[in-house]
């Protein structure tokens, strides 16, 4: 037979308190199976304790002690001392709670001692010098006859007393205990674990109910990122639909107003005049649709085609007089339409009214014609579209036409005003340039600043003119 290993012998000795020879004997009896040998040892101890306690006919097992005196300790013979039954359930509880898998744990003995101390039902008074009477284990002869003592049992008591500083507290106490007191087992621990699991389940269910209640009362309080994006998309779609409805409504109002206004008129602003043939609009010019303007806004605009824009007109010609209304009042009515609908009536005038209107502002037109070449010559060279510092400025005029040109970020704002004045559509000094979002207005006083200083650094910037009152 293979002899037990040294580790198994040391483990058996440290757990049971037996001697080395007894540990070797027990391990050999159980085929070097350490857990079985230890379990057999504690079963023998438990059987011996129950057999010995059943022979005792006395009813008073308990030890009644106080701080300085133990009753009957002087008159009772040493060999009549009996173990205090209060300590036995603790040992039995430790034996029943033993798990072989814990043998490798260095804190195993400490855990056993904690279980023993936790199973004690009463507090421990100060230790007494009468060890035979107080601790329940006789000082000279613990079990009387040696043949009735199980092998290694005496070493068990000594081992526990030696290894456990709280051993005395497990057998001391002023509470009277019987041999029939209940023995603690793992049932209490299982009940505590089961109660903790049930409490955890209950908390989880309450948390789900609270979350569902909060969602029912305030669904917007906990929205996922996808739901937030969907709501934003719905808001954008709603805003676009409202914008389209307003545009249709304005179109209907324009049609109703067109019934009371001339069918063919040339727009002329009192603050602007132009006699240049390239910017004079004749009847029969083609209509420019809004979608074409939007397409042109996304593309770089050639300066040669920036000055060509068509206005909407109808087949009929504008008569010379409308119920005695002079041309000046008619022009004011056209400007009123612009103020109401945010734009200017895109209609061309008849040849007769063109002559009448341009006669009133012939002198300013001549001055603008003379200044146009000078302003065009003062403009810097237009950079190419591949230049990283180039920006395209698209300006919407009051007549809904768009003019654009490329500049460098280092160019001054004055060049933009020169470019607009060179177009001859508005009178210099009567307007300002506005960026819609974030809204910011630029006047001629800002002409010394560069586009980069004015935060006009995007590849394409959309601006519009705002006439000064």
Swiss-Prot record:
Gene3D superfamilies: Phosphatidylinositol 3-kinase Catalytic Subunit, Chain A, domain 1. PROSITE patterns: UBX, UIM. PANTHER family: FAS-ASSOCIATED PROTEIN (PTHR23322), PLANT UBX DOMAIN-CONTAINING PROTEIN 9 (PTHR23322:SF55). The modification Phosphoserine is found at residues 181, 224. Residues 119-129 have a biased composition (Low complexity). Keywords: Phosphoprotein, Repeat, Ubl conjugation pathway. It holds the Pfam family UBX. It comes from the Eukaryota. Residues 271-289 have a biased composition (Polar residues). This is Plant UBX domain-containing protein 9. Residues 188-207, 231-250 form the UIM domain. The keyword Protein transport does not apply. Residues 119-188, 264-324, 355-383 are annotated as: Disordered. Signal peptide: none annotated. Residues 4-43 form the UBA-like domain. Residues 368-377 have a biased composition (Basic and acidic residues). SMART domains: UBX (SM00166), UIM (SM00726). Residues 386-464 form the UBX domain. InterPro entries: UBA-like_sf, Ubiquitin-like_domsf, UBX_dom, UBX_domain-protein, UIM_dom. The keyword Repeat applies.
């Amino acid at each position: 037979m293979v002899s037990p290993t040294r580790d198994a012998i040391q483990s058996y000795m440290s757990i049971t308190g037996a001697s080395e020879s007894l540990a070797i004997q027990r391990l050999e009896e159980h085929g070097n199976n350490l857990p079985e040998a230890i379990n057999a040892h504690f079963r023998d101890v438990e059987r011996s304790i129950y057999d010995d306690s059943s022979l005792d006919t006395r009813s008073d097992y308990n030890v009644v002690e106080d701080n300085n005196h133990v009753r009957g300790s002087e008159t009772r013979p040493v060999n009549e001392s009996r173990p205090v039954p209060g300590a036995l359930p603790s040992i039995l509880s430790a034996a029943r709670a033993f798990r072989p898998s814990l043998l490798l744990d260095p804190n195993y003995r400490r855990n056993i001692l904690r279980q023993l101390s936790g199973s004690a039902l009463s507090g421990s008074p100060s230790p007494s010098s009468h060890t035979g009477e107080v601790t329940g284990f006789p000082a000279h002869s613990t079990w009387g006859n040696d043949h009735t003592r199980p092998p290694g049992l005496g070493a068990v008591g000594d081992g526990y007393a030696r290894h456990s500083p709280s051993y005395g507290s497990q057998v001391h106490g002023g509470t009277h205990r019987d041999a029939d007191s209940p023995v603690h087992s793992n049932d209490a621990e299982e009940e505590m674990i089961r109660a903790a699991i049930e409490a955890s389940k209950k908390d989880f269910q309450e948390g789900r109910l609270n979350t569902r209640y909060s969602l029912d009362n305030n669904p917007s309080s906990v929205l996922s990122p996808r739901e937030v994006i969907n709501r934003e998309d719905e808001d954008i779609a709603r805003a676009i639909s409202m914008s389209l409805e307003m545009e249709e409504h304005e179109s209907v109002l324009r049609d109703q107003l067109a019934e009371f206004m001339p069918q063919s008129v040339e727009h002329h602003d009192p603050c602007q005049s132009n006699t240049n043939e390239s910017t004079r609009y004749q009847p029969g010019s083609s209509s420019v649709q809004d979608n074409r303007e939007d397409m042109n806004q996304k593309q770089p605009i050639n300066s040669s085609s920036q000055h060509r824009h068509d206005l909407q007109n109808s087949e009929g010609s504008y008569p010379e007089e409308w119920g005695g209304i002079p041309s000046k009042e008619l022009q004011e009515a056209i400007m009123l339409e612009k103020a109401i609908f945010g734009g200017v009536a895109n209609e061309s005038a008849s040849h007769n009214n063109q002559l009448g209107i341009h006669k009133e502002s012939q002198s300013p037109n001549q001055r603008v014609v003379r200044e146009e070449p000078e302003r065009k010559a003062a403009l810097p060279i237009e950079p190419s579209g591949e230049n990283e510092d180039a920006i395209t400025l698209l300006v919407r005029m009051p007549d809904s036409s768009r003019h654009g040109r490329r500049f460098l970020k280092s160019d001054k704002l004055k060049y933009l005003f020169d470019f607009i004045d060179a177009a001859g559509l508005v009178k210099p000094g009567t307007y300002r340039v506005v960026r819609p979002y974030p809204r910011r207005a630029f006047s001629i006083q800002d002409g010394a600043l560069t586009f980069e200083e004015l935060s006009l650094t995007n590849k394409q910037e959309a601006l519009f003119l705002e006439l000064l009152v």
